[in-house]
Amino acid sequence: TISTEEGEKRPDFIFIDTQGNIDVVEIKKSYNASVLAKSNKKSTRNNYVPSRDLTIAIMQIEKYIYHLNRTGLKSETKICNTLREKNHIDMPIRIRNPQGVIILGRSNELNEEQQSDYEVIKRQYKHIADILTYDDLLNRLTILLNHFENK
């Protein structure tokens, strides 16, 4: 958990790399959660925009990262102590520009226009979080497995 003036914040997961740097993961469990919403407003020229579920997940990740950066040393110590106590892992933790990972929804049935707008949205928020659908995640894992099986 991350202690803040708003109370305790609890990301779904925190990934720790081999150097002790952390990233925050937010998983939306509903496979039916939409990543896109159709905008009918003239101002958006009928483009697809981030869905409400995706917008909420992005905001959650941004707040986790904000609070981690604000509480840097305190959070590093807290995570380090938790790792040592619960997992018997003793390694330094570093909060240095953490990134987010958001997993939600499906993308295998998006049409070409939706796929294009989804890609724009993913790239637009790349500096904050890697946005993945469950289909994206499965595709990445399949490619990774195939790579190692063919070696």
What label would you give each PLM region?
Residues T1-K151:
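Charged, terminal alpha-helix-loop-beta segments
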